[in-house]
């Protein structure tokens, strides 16, 4: 039987920072998760770890891959978008970039 790859994460897109008409709150990012299209489906992802993986030019501890970690905090609206808070705010160049929503910690 051939080995199949299994992902422990779901792909997501960084949409924007949370904002009002005049003020932008970069501490909270809006994230659209693939396959999540309602507020009820978004409830499953609350508390899950989320990360942005990127590459740099200078290796640190032998690796050029770096990660910014965060957690999914609450739903945003009725269309499956969630709010996420990261340890370091995501830079604006990540708008539209791919994120990973880990399927842990599990609350099932």
UniProtKB/Swiss-Prot annotation:
A Gene Ontology cellular-component term: cytosol
Gene Ontology MF terms: rRNA binding; structural constituent of ribosome; zinc ion binding
InterPro entries: Ribosomal_eL33, Ribosomal_eL33_CS, Ribosomal_eL33_sf, Transl_B-barrel_sf
Keyword Transcription attached: no
Entries under PROSITE patterns matching the protein: RIBOSOMAL_L35AE (PS01105)
One GO biological process term: cytoplasmic translation
Keyword Magnesium on entry: no
Family: Belongs to the eukaryotic ribosomal protein eL33 family.
Remarks, miscellaneous: There are 2 genes for eL33 in S.pombe.
Biological role: Component of the ribosome, a large ribonucleoprotein complex responsible for the synthesis of proteins in the cell. The small ribosomal subunit (SSU) binds messenger RNAs (mRNAs) and translates the encoded message by selecting cognate aminoacyl-transfer RNA (tRNA) molecules. The large subunit (LSU) contains the ribosomal catalytic site termed the peptidyl transferase center (PTC), which catalyzes the formation of peptide bonds, thereby polymerizing the amino acids delivered by tRNAs into a polypeptide chain.
HAMAP family cross-referenced by the UniProt entry: Ribosomal_eL33
Subunit structure: Component of the large ribosomal subunit (LSU). Mature yeast ribosomes consist of a small (40S) and a large (60S) subunit. The 40S small subunit contains 1 molecule of ribosomal RNA (18S rRNA) and at least 33 different proteins. The large 60S subunit contains 3 rRNA molecules (25S, 5.8S and 5S rRNA) and at least 46 different proteins.
Protein name listed in UniProt: Large ribosomal subunit protein eL33A
Gene, per the UniProt record: rpl35b
């Amino acid at each position: 039987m051939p080995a199949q790859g299994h992902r422990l994460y779901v792909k997501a897109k960084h949409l924007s920072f949370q904002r009002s008409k005049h003020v932008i709150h970069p501490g909270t990012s809006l994230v659209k998760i693939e396959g999540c299209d309602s507020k009820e489906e978004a409830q499953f992802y609350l508390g899950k770890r989320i990360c942005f993986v990127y590459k740099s030019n200078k290796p640190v501890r032998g690796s050029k891959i770096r990660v910014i970690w965060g957690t999914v905090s609450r739903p945003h609206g009725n269309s499956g978008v969630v709010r996420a808070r990261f340890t370091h705010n995501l830079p604006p160049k990540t708008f539209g970039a791919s994120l990973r929503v880990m399927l842990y910690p599990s609350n099932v």
